[in-house]
């Protein structure tokens, strides 16, 4: 992680080996290593103030993997997130209420599986009730998720459709 300045940071985590035999040459049993998917990820984050009683943060990154395959036990590599964006905003003590907004958008990619995009949106409001003998914090929110699938098989029910969940 590297501080860029004024609330911005950049990060890079890139792992790669020369070939699928890399770990087998170190040990005869690939299961003896815990690394089968090497993360390759980089992105930026921002953390800042949202007025006197608030904060806001953004994250954007891309992530893929180098999958080390054992020819005797092949498996499907994980989905890549190309890209992923998220945002969180909190504003506290506005008329004795706290407001929060969380959201993210991710493009999932896989060379052989169904691709898709996911949108998550979660606005919520809470009313902190505190005194010297205890507290209770009622909270109301709406959690919305939308999936848009690509490359689905012809017989799939949701090919080219959006799948919503609230």
What does each of the following model-derived ranges do?
Residues 1-166:
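Outer-membrane beta-barrel proteins and related beta-barrel translocases across Gram-negative bacteria
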């Amino acid at each position: 992680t590297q501080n860029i300045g004024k609330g911005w940071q950049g990060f890079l985590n890139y792992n790669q080996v020369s070939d699928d035999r890399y770990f087998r040459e170190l040990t005869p049993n690939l299961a003896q290593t815990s690394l089968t998917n090497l993360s390759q990820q980089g992105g930026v984050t921002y953390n800042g103030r949202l007025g006197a009683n608030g904060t806001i943060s953004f994250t954007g990154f891309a992530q893929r993997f180098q999958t080390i395959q054992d020819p005797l036990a092949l498996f499907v590599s994980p989905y890549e997130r190309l890209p992923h964006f998220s945002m969180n905003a909190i504003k506290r003590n506005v008329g004795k209420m706290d407001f929060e907004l969380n959201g993210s958008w991710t493009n999932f990619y896989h060379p052989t599986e169904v691709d898709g995009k996911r949108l998550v949106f979660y606005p919520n409001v809470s009313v902190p009730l505190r005194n010297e003998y205890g507290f209770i914090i009622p909270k109301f929110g709406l959690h919305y998720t939308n999936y848009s699938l690509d490359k689905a098989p012809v017989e799939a029910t949701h090919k080219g459709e959006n799948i919503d969940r609230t």
